[in-house]
């Protein structure tokens, strides 16, 4: 690893840690100038595409999913770390399955499954947008479904 300060390639790893998203943070020290710096290593993942209802294919966007989850959990006792964990779990599951595409329907179902375990109000909020509720009956049905559990 090349030192960002003096460009020497003579560096050593002082400390390594796995971060919440699965990447590895390494603290390094240059043997030439003795300065320290951090590097992050992450597996290169194959891109995943989301197939929309109209059959368009768009590249999976972690930030878009985070925005949807943030909206669904607004004013709920759900931390950013919990949302990151949901997203990371879904991403790992997709990478492990070795698929290159997922339908927006299947992705939405995976999110709903995670939200149902985490917060029932957020689950109903997300479902109302994802399933395009257009009347109060849809809300009543989903609440009744939750009450059965």
Swiss-Prot record:
InterPro entries: ATP-cone_dom (IPR005144), NrdR-like_N (IPR055173), RNR_NrdR-like (IPR003796). Keywords: ATP-binding, DNA-binding, Metal-binding, Nucleotide-binding, Repressor, Transcription, Transcription regulation, Zinc, Zinc-finger. Binds 1 zinc ion. It holds the Pfam family Zn_ribbon_NrdR. GO terms for biological process: negative regulation of DNA-templated transcription. The keyword Metal-binding applies. A zinc finger (unnamed) spans 3-33. One of its GO terms (molecular function) is double-stranded DNA binding. Its cofactor is Zn(2+). Belongs to the NrdR family. PANTHER family: TRANSCRIPTIONAL REPRESSOR NRDR. Negatively regulates transcription of bacterial ribonucleotide reductase nrd genes and operons by binding to NrdR-boxes. This is Transcriptional repressor NrdR.
